[in-house]
From Swiss-Prot:
Keywords: Actin-binding, Coiled coil, Cytoplasm, Cytoskeleton, Phosphoprotein. Can bind at least three actin monomers and thereby provides a nucleus for actin filament formation. Interacts (via N-terminus) with tropomyosin alpha (TPM1) (via N-terminus). May also interact with TPM2 (via N-terminus). Interacts with FLII. Residues 457-515 form a coiled coil. It comes from Rattus norvegicus. Residues 91-166, 179-200, 358-455, 469-534 are annotated as: Disordered. Residues 150-163, 179-192, 390-401, 469-478 have a biased composition (Polar residues). It is found in: Cytoplasm, Myofibril, Sarcomere; Cytoplasm, Myofibril; Cytoplasm, Myofibril, Sarcomere, M line; Cytoplasm, Cytoskeleton. This is Leiomodin-2. Pfam families: Tropomodulin. Belongs to the tropomodulin family. The lineage of its organism: Eukaryota, Metazoa, Chordata, Craniata, Vertebrata. One of its GO terms (biological process) is positive regulation of actin filament polymerization. GO terms for cellular component: actin filament; cardiac myofibril; cytoskeleton; M band; myofibril; sarcomere; striated muscle thin filament. The keyword Ribosomal protein does not apply. GO terms for molecular function: actin binding; actin monomer binding; tropomyosin binding.
């Protein structure tokens, strides 16, 4: 009955016209109906994360322009690329202002502002784009004028002093020409400070090269580390200049994209130069060919003590490592090698080579010190002897004098003439009369005979040796065996007693505790031992008893 009643309730909606109902609905009711239908039957083409209905009721403030957003991103990326290429470290104040205005404009376009404000911002953005295009054209004109001035054709006089951006661009170009070493002139920039590389290395390449060529006494180290825009030809020029230099001690060009050509130029320099003690070519593009060229050059170099070539782009390989060890076997001056050998064999042999070199350097240093001491000692020998002869001052204070005067002993000199007459001694008293015999004391008892005691142990080693020698002589003279045995046992017993007396009490206790207990023999064992030790000659005939006959 329930199902029939439900169908009966639905039958009344069959005669209703749907179009009339939809036409009678308002706009808000239609939106609500669409939301309900979306929840009931979502669009299958949309991903699952986007099928839910939007819960935000904020009205859009303006039309979204994808082209404007793409243009803004392209412009920002171009600016970043230019800054990286020019090596600009800090931002100028005007650029900061312009970028902040552009960011404000871009954010305000997406904020809750009316459409009228949005149109005004679009007009401002178009005006700023036109201004930037004009500034770009001015920068291009400045660059052309600067290049003409460098080539020596036109003088640089057409720059507007009010515009600070072209000036900064000009200074950046001049700094690049100075650091890269590609410009032919010697123009200096007086308006801007010294050029700074993006890597942070403040070395000016052209100045450093000139100092090396002029053999400047202040430049003992050439540091070209992390300069990426330096060319292989420039590195070769440095190597050529260092051939005749006598001041530079350290030459480092880590992370400069140096290749085998630069390594071969450095090898040629090491064959000639006798003053450089440290070379660093780590983190470059040098292969095994360039490294082996440097190792062959070290066979003719007796000054270099440190070489670093680890972390190259190409792997050296086992063959190159073994060849390095072979080439460095004859070298006796290299003390530090900056490379991690992959194979254990070359690694251990290289460690032994470096240890040998360090030991030789230590011996050489000690020998030089001895020679210096010998030269100094010959000159100051007399002074040393004189110093030994003179008494040195005592570190202790002198003893204080006693407040009491010491007693004076009068010396009496007795002579024969001045000797006074000696007084006459009185006569001795007469002896007492003898006592009667019954009054005499009893005589003392006779002394007891000495007890036969043990012989005292003498610790005189000389006496023991004499006794041993006498015993040996007695044996050699052909005395009887019994007598020889007794004499032989006597020194042995004395030696044992000496050893026991010299031992400590703890050692004796340890010996007694560690010594096993002597086993007690039975009567049967004694009988069997006597039978074993007897012979037929010792046996005697015994009559057989009558009971056994």
């Amino acid at each position: 009955m329930s199902t029939f009643g439900y169908r009966r309730g639905l039958s009344k909606y069959e005669s209703i016209d749907e179009d009339e109902l939809l036409a009678s609905l308002t706009a808000e009711e239609l939106k609500e109906l669409e939301r309900e239908l979306e929840d009931i039957e979502p669009d299958r083409n949309l991903p699952v994360g986007l099928r839910q209905k939007s819960l935000t009721e904020k009205t859009p403030t303006g039309n979204f322009s994808r082209e404007a957003l793409m243009a803004y991103w392209e412009k920002e990326s171009q600016k970043l690329l230019e800054k990286e290429r020019l090596g600009e470290c800090g931002k100028l104040a005007e650029e900061d202002k312009e970028e902040s205005e552009e960011e404000l404009i871009f954010t305000e376009s997406n904020s809750e502002v009316s459409e009228e404000v949005c149109t005004e911002e679009e007009e401002e953005s178009t005006e700023e784009e036109e201004e930037e295009e004009e500034e770009d054209s001015e920068e291009e004109e400045v660059t052309t004028e600067v290049t003409k001035h460098i080539n020596g054709t036109v003088s640089h006089n057409g720059v507007n002093p009010d515009n600070s951006k072209p000036k900064t661009f000009k200074s950046q170009i001049e700094n690049i020409n100075l650091t890269n070493g590609n410009s032919g002139g010697t123009q200096r920039n007086t308006e801007s400070p010294a050029a700074i590389h993006p890597c942070g290395n403040p070395t000016v390449i052209e100045d450093a090269l000139e100092k090396i060529k002029n053999n400047d006494p202040d430049t003992t180290e050439v540091n070209l580390n992390n300069i990426e825009n330096i060319t292989t030809q420039t590195l070769s020029r440095f190597a050529e200049a260092l051939k005749e230099n006598t001041v530079v001690k350290t030459f480092s060009l880590a992370n400069t994209h140096a290749d085998d050509a630069a390594a071969i130029a450095i090898a040629e320099m090491l064959k000639v130069n006798e003053h450089i003690t440290s070379v660093n070519v780590e983190s470059n593009f040098i292969t095994g060919k360039g490294i082996l060229a440097i190792m062959r050059a070290l066979q003719h170099n007796t000054v270099l003590t440190e070489l670093r070539f680890h972390n190259q782009r190409h792997i050296m390989g086992s063959q190159v490592e073994m060849e390095i060890v072979k080439l460095l076997k004859e070298n006796t001056t290299l003390l530090r090698l900056g490379y991690h050998f992959e194979l254990p064999g070359p690694r251990m042999s290289m460690t032994s080579i470096l240890t040998r070199n360090m030991d030789k350097q230590r011996q050489k240093r000690m020998q030089e010190q001895k020679q210096q001491e010998g030269h100094d000692g010959g000159a100051t020998l007399r002074t040393k002897v004189w110093q030994r002869g003179t008494p040195g001052s005592s570190p202790y204070a002198s003893p204080r004098q006693s407040p009491w005067s010491s007693p004076k002993v009068s010396k009496k000199v007795h002579t024969g003439r001045s000797r006074p007459p000696s007084p006459v001694a009185p006569p001795p008293p007469p002896p007492p009369p003898p006592l009667p015999p019954h009054m005499l004391p009893p005589p003392p008892p006779p002394p007891a005979p000495p007890l036969p005691g043990k012989k005292l142990i003498t610790r005189n080693i000389a006496e023991v040796i004499k006794q041993q020698e006498s015993a040996q002589r007695a044996l050699q003279n052909g005395q009887r065996k019994k007598k020889g045995k007794k004499v032989k046992k006597q020194p042995n017993n004395i030696l044992k007693e000496i050893k026991n007396s010299l031992r400590s009490v703890q050692e004796k206790k340890m010996e007694e505790s560690s010594r096993p207990s002597t086993p007690q023999r039975s009567a049967h064992e004694n009988l069997m031992e006597a039978i074993r030790g007897s012979s037929i000659r010792q046996l005697r005939r015994v009559e057989v008893p009558e009971a056994l006959r």
